[in-house]
Amino acid sequence: MSEGYIVLVMQLVLIELNEINFEYAKKYFDILKIDTIKNINKELIETESENSDEMLEPWIQWHSIHTGCTAKDHGVFRLGDAINSKKIQIFEELEANHLTVGSISAMNSINNLKNPSYFIPDPWTNTKSDDSFFSKIITLVLKDTVNNNASAKFSIKNYIYLIIIFLRFV
């Protein structure tokens, strides 16, 4: 006689929306009849961590969200400062609890994952992507584009990479 097993598959999707006005967004959710987004909107959790305006910068707030610490506790106050932080992020916590973790451009987060499914850092944080070819070239194109934005430079190499990325994913 064979034994039966129940396999529980747990999924968590964290979508980070930066500087969204939810009053306006809700109107679009209603007009476009996007039920999934409307359901997410019903279950929003509002939190407070800072009470001074200078601590409300998104790169500070996102690191607070990723670590569960206040700005004072994590000490990250500028874009890219996360690389100096020793705080454990949600990504490592999830991986330690046997979840597969992937991240695309989570602001001011660092790749301390042992085995990411994928990891593409934000363009301002000097941390590595995962080891896949596509994550590496997407990271390179993002960083080059953002960091050379003021000079309006876009290299031929990046155009070629974009074509490769487009052909692979679109």
Show which residues each predicted segment covers.
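Short, structured active-site-proximal loop/turn typified by the sulfatase FGly-forming signature C/S-X-P-X-R
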Residues: 23-62, 70-73, 100-102
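Short, Lys/Arg-enriched N-terminal segments with co-localized hydrophobic residues
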Residues: 1-9
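Intrinsically disordered, low-complexity regions
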Residues: 9, 17, 34, 112-117
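Intrinsically disordered, low-complexity N-terminal regions enriched in serine/proline/glycine
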Residues: 4, 27, 158-160
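His/Asp/Glu-rich, glycine-adjacent segments
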Residues: 68-170
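Beta-strand elements within well-structured catalytic alpha/beta cores of enzymes
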Residues: 10-25, 65, 94
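Short, charged/polar micro-motifs that form catalytic or ligand-binding hotspots
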Residues: 11, 15, 55, 80-84
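Short linear interaction motif-like sites in intrinsically disordered regions of transcription factors
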Residues: 2, 60-63, 125
